[in-house]
Amino acid sequence: MKKVLSISAVVLLLFASCSKEIIPDVKDTDATQNRLKSYSSGTNNGYFWSIWKSDGMTGYANYANGSGGNYSVSWNMNGNFTCGKGWSNGSKTRTVGYNCGAFTLNGGGGSMAYYGWSRNPLMEYYVNENWGASRPASGNSLRTVSSDGGSYNVYTAWRSNAPSIDGTKSFRQIYSTRTSKNSTGQNHSITFANHANAWSAAGYGLGSDMSPAAILLTEAWGQSNGYCNVTVW
């Protein structure tokens, strides 16, 4: 997992809608305009979706909404992008269903995860289901939790003066990572309450405000190429 996970915060920072369902790579010489144009979000078939690309990213990351909760993204780039589809608000008791038809990642780093934020206190969370060559396992190891037929290691880290959904803030990251990648082409569940309860038992309960969006995220960084096709429900 990328050391500065909170760069994914930009995905959930804005909620501007976009009529296009396929979002091509964005190029602009003006840094401010590039920052704005490289973020798109909206709703599709009742699901919230978003894609964000870092300033200076070269190459491409092409996101497309499919039917229902489906989306796909293909990329060949050097930089960082995040995208996904899910809900306009989080929930500590949501059970996420998904089927990842394909996930390939060559070079760089990245993961596919259930992702979101809470407030009061401000916290960033991930449940990592799949990844590239490097398993997300940075930060302090806290405990192990069993859920949905798998075993997850729980990690936490403190971020000081880092990007967040509320601007530059200090906040805690908390995340669960499966001990092995989940399989593709099959239906899976993420019983989020199991993770939220395990984090709370370790002393790092999520905030009381779960209103920020929560998505099934695809993220990649560095020099990488790949493809993900996933349906969430």
Give the residues covered by each predicted segment.
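Sec-dependent signal peptide recognition
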Residues: 2-8
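Extracellular-facing/secreted segment signature in eukaryotic proteins
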Residues: 46-47, 56-66, 145-160, 186-191
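Extracellular-facing segments of soluble proteins and assemblies that are Gly/Ser/Thr-biased and enriched
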Residues: 84-147
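Bacterial Sec-dependent N-terminal signal peptides
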Residues: 5, 16-38
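Boundary/junction segments of secreted and surface-exposed precursor proteins
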Residues: 38-46, 50
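Short N-terminal edge-element motif at the start of the domain
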Residues: 31-39, 58-106
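Long, compositionally biased interface segments
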Residues: 186-233
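An exposed acidic His-Trp-rich patch
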Residues: 121-184
